[in-house]
From Swiss-Prot:
Its EC number is 5.3.1.5. This is Xylose isomerase. The keyword Transport does not apply. Binds 2 magnesium ions per subunit.
Length: 440
């Protein structure tokens, strides 16, 4: 079959001085960073949905892209054509992983029977493509938000029949993920929230969502799926308020239903922006709570109130993110999935490459800066100094539960305590980070 991206062999590393827009300037898969290959640190993935399913439509305009697999025709044939182009893209971009929703890769059909038959046929196609290309599945998931049946949610829907349909999709998608060697399975509650409290029973919906997640965990163990289950937090859009608002909110939810040891988090940069947080904050929070799993690498626009899903281009922002990830030991089953799309006006098919190449170079530079921060150790040293008092006898007695509140009150009085505030040196630390970023 004729190549779709016929003007490109494969994207390769050419170094920082290259002027070739279809080459990497900073991402060298085999370069060692802290003793580990760059590819193994970053674990890049390209997503199926934005890259091959979006037709360029928005709230104010119809599809702007001319994609052969999006033209009228027999649905399964077009899905197979899309898979051909997708794996050509993954191979030529030189990414080790990809991600999908069930209906990204397969026609949904008019019934559950059609859905399952179509998906089974396309999973065979994907398995063959993976074997041929060497590209692996980072994670799979089920789209339980696009079809009109999910207008009031999937797991939180007031109709248990909709809940059951969603369960069928998750069962099918998780089993497909297992068969394809997927390393994670993601749960994103696109419509698990509310538009108005006037018709919403918050306690009922929370109980439904908790039971659904418990059943997902049960099914994972039943089928022997060895990957990681991930929830992807988002505060709103398409609903007014979503129950998986941010990392801290999801932690509280998981604790309530006894799932904090079973499910981790897939953190998206743009969702952090929508929640009023920095990307750095959400990553650091997930790590502090023991829930860090994977990353959807993109960026939002702080001046806009919706999910713009742009490609990451800030080394400053992502260096701090990679610093937290490296300190925590790096990715295990997770990776950096580019949940990002070209702009509607970017109608050249090679714009897909320009967006991903720039993003991969950005994350490679961020990794190198983070490695310098780790190797130098100054930032870590200053944080340790700031909290060093907690290593004292008093600090340890407090943390180990050996002193009560009244014991502490007596201690303060007996020792005539008069502590003096110590500078946090924020400006110094910000300058230190700039040193890592910009000084050679």
């Amino acid at each position: 079959m004729q190549a779709y991206f016929d003007q490109l062999d494969r994207v390769r590393y050419e170094g920082p001085k290259t002027t070739n827009p279809l080459a990497f300037r900073h991402y060298n898969p085999d370069e060692l960073v802290l003793g580990k290959r760059m590819e193994d640190h970053l674990r890049f993935a390209a997503c199926y949905w934005h890259t091959f399913c979006w037709n360029g439509a928005d709230m104010f305009g119809v599809g702007a892209f001319d994609r052969p697999w999006q033209q009228p025709g027999e649905a399964l044939m077009l899905a197979k054509r899309k898979a051909d182009v997708a794996f050509e893209f993954f191979h030529k971009l030189n990414v080790p992983f990809y991600c999908f929703h069930d209906v990204d890769v397969s026609p949904e059909g008019a019934s559950l029977k059609e859905y399952k038959n179509n998906f089974a046929e396309m999973v065979d196609v994907l398995a063959a493509k993976q074997e041929q290309s060497g590209v692996k599945l980072l994670w799979g998931t089920a789209n339980c938000f696009t079809n009109p049946r999910y207008g009031a949610g999937a797991a939180t829907n007031p109709d248990p029949e909709v809940f059951s349909w969603a369960a069928t999709q998750v069962v099918t998608a998780m089993e497909a993920t297992k068969r394809l060697g997927g390393e994670n399975y993601v749960l994103w509650g696109g419509r698990e929230g509310y538009e108005t409290l006037l018709n919403t029973d918050l306690r009922q919906e929370r109980e439904q969502l908790g039971r659904f997640m418990q059943m997902v965990v049960e099914h994972k163990h039943k089928i022997g799926f060895q990957g990681t289950l991930l929830i992807e937090p988002k505060p709103q859009e398409p609903t007014k308020h979503q129950y998986d608002y941010d990392a801290a909110t999801v932690y509280g939810f998981l604790k309530q239903f006894g799932l904090e040891k079973e499910i981790k988090l897939n953190i998206e940069a743009n969702h952090a922006t929508l929640a009023g947080h920095s990307f750095h904050h959400e990553i650091a929070t997930a790590i502090a709570l023991g829930l860090f799993g994977s990353v959807d690498a993109n960026r939002g626009d702080a001046q806009l109130g919706w999910d713009t899903d742009q490609f990451p281009n800030s080394v400053e922002e992502n260096a701090l993110v990679m610093y937290e990830i490296l300190k925590a030991g790096g990715f295990t089953t997770g990776g950096l999935n580019f949940d990002a799309k070209v702009r509607r006006q970017s109608t050249d098919k090679y714009d897909l490459f320009y967006g991903h190449i720039g993003a991969m170079d950005t994350m490679a530079l961020a990794l190198k800066v983070a490695a310098r921060m780790i190797e130098d150790g100054e930032l870590d040293k200053r944080v340790a100094q700031r909290y060093s008092g907690w290593n004292s006898e008093l600090g340890q007695q407090i943390l180990k539960g050996q002193m009560s509140l009244s014991d502490l009150a007596k201690y303060a009085q007996d020792h005539n305590l008069s502590p003096v505030h110590q500078s946090g040196h924020q400006e110094l630390l910000e300058s230190l980070v700039n040193h890592y970023l910009f000084d050679k």
